């Protein structure tokens, strides 16, 4: 990631897949909400070291534990212990309908400086969105990317920790694609960066980076 990270006036969106998960003991979480396994924890520690010196303006995570702990691994390496904003809207595709992930209080057990994102992107009082169909997944990831583009500006960098399938939708949304016939093979804790430029175009700067 350091090799391709340059101050070129773009808005940088870095999408990171979570570390290796374990679904054998989800405790009081839904069966779709796995934790990191021992390998995943070590992968995330290495991820934190990779991002230790990369300047980031904001951190987002889905409300699924494996993604949040991945984001936390980066933030724990930062001197200022930055906040992680939790967005249920970027949960994994196919997550059990009606389950919107872990609460803010629950996730603070793993990293204290956590808070729910300051807006519900569907404008409803309660979370109410689907993760099942292609159209549902396109809609919620597009809303999230538009939210980032409205909130942040050129020259800033945002990290988003999420899951395999959601990451593919997010990358496509950041690139401005409405339809696509390709699929990415995201490695655990890999980083994929899309740059958005003032001139109105987007660039896939790196894919599946592990360094």
Regions found by a protein language model. Give the residues of each.
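Short beta-strand scaffold positions
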Residues: 61-62, 139, 161-162
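An N-terminal RHG(E/S)-centered segment typical of histidine phosphatases
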Residues: 1-57, 72-76, 154, 196-211
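Short glycine/proline- and acidic residue-enriched helix-loop micro-motifs
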Residues: 111-136
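Phosphate-coordination/substrate-recognition cap region in phosphate-metabolizing enzymes
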Residues: 8, 45-119, 180
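Generic beta-sheet signal
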Residues: 13, 156-164
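Domain-level recognition of soluble alpha/beta enzyme cores
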Residues: 178-203
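Active-site metal-coordination segments of metallo-dependent hydrolases
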Residues: 30-39, 128-135, 183
């Amino acid at each position: 990631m350091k090799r391709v990270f340059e101050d070129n006036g773009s808005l940088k969106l870095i999408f990171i897949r979570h570390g290796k998960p374990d679904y054998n003991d989800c405790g009081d979480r839904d069966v779709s909400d796995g934790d990191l396994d021992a390998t995943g924890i070590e992968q995330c520690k290495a991820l934190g070291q990779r991002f230790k010196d990369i300047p980031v303006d904001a951190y987002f995570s889905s409300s699924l534990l494996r993604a949040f702990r991945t984001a936390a691994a980066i933030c724990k390496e930062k001197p200022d212990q930055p906040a992680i904003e939790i967005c249920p809207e970027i949960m994994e595709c196919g997550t059990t309908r009606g389950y919107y992930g872990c609460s803010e209080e629950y996730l603070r057990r793993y990293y204290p400086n956590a808070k729910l994102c300051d807006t519900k992107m569907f404008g409803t009082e309660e979370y109410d969105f689907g993760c099942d169909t292609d159209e549902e997944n396109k809609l919620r990831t597009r809303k999230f990317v538009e939210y980032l583009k409205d909130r942040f500006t050129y020259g800033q960098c945002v990290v988003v920790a999420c899951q395999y399938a959601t990451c593919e939708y997010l990358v496509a949304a950041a690139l401005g694609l409405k339809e696509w016939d390709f699929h990415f093979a995201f490695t655990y804790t890999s980083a994929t960066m899309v740059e958005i430029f003032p001139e109105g175009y987007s660039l896939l700067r790196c894919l599946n980076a592990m360094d």
